[in-house]
Amino acid sequence: MKSAYAQSGVDYTLLEPFKQQMIAAGKRTLSFPNRRGVYINEEVLHAHGGVFEYHGTLPHLWCNTQEGLGNKNWIAEWMYQHDGTGRTHYASIAKDTALMAVNDVIAQGALPVVYTDEVAVGDSAWFGDERRAADLAQGFYEICEEVGMALPAGESPALRYLIKPEPPVTAAPSLSGCVTGIIAPRERLITGSNLAPGDHIIAAASSGLHANGISLVIKKALELKDSFLTMLPTGRTLGEEALIPTRSYVALVETLLAHEVAVHALLPGTGDGVGKLAYDKRPFTYRIHSWLSVPPLFTYFREAIGLPLQDCLKTFNWGAGYYLFVPESEAERVCALGREAGYELMDVGVVAEGERCVVFEPEGVTLPPPGH
């Protein structure tokens, strides 16, 4: 018979196997930050905290960032319930979750070394799906290996009175995490204060939707006859396109730092779409003269669903997952180094003095700054 606490939504018999999967995955990551001179204390036998130290000799700084995934795993849950494939999609969801914080921390020139996660559910029953739990743990392991960070600790609360997903999804956790990055030597710190008129804007291609604009995608998909099972011209369903994992830009930034490129600012292409380019509060105009290929999901939303272009550009990354602001003299070298590191980069525009906005010349549209 279940305990009174289990009947109230917190069942440790379901939670414990999940925790052990995550702890086991985390232990396999502890050596990953060694390549950056950071070492995890492996004598800590629980997941209540991660203890780490820097063994290098360079003067250094630490950078800490916390970010949540948002609603993207709601789509994963819908697909798991309805697409008939048995795929949970949670390996890629784990990567999305971690990269929300990781792609932010590198904007300061910090390289990720430690990550802690939170998987908050509405009911402990969610933890009882062994396949989904295994996929999530494996996804966290894989992204830690890719970017060079450890997962020494985490949190997995059951919050029945706080977390209740919208139907038809019956259960979905709130996913988030905190990353610590190291800036070594400390002179590699990038604050954005060097951004200036004349700088070139280099855009790095996204893999697709990433994790912004999800609420709009869900709303519009549920209005379609086949919802997330709607077939797109790519041969994949709308749900499959939406769940393509976020791209990591760690290797790109690490390459530029290693080659001592004069980067004036770095910017993740996340909230506010292309309009986020005008994040700096100074009176700069961001003139975009060229653009990357637009992912098919965005084209579908514009052409088949009829979403106005202004909404598209202010909601989605529109094909650019990261921006680099560099002096004109560095633009060509940045694109070449990025290609060598495996990224598609394009010199898409220039920073100019003027009204704070984004002039998107390929479509003849002017976008206001974030929050407007």
Regions found by a protein language model. Give the residues of each.
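Gly-rich Lys/Arg/Thr-decorated short loops/hinges at beta-loop-alpha junctions or inter-strand turns
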Residues: 2, 72-84, 229-237, 282
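N-terminal amphipathic/basic leader segments beginning at the initiator methionine
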Residues: 1-35, 39
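Conserved helix-loop functional segments at active or binding sites
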Residues: 28, 71, 104-107, 121, ...
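Glycine-rich phosphate/pyrophosphate-binding loop regions near the starts of catalytic domains
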Residues: 34-207, 367-371
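Active-site pocket-shaping loop/turn-to-helix segments
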Residues: 87-95, 236-248
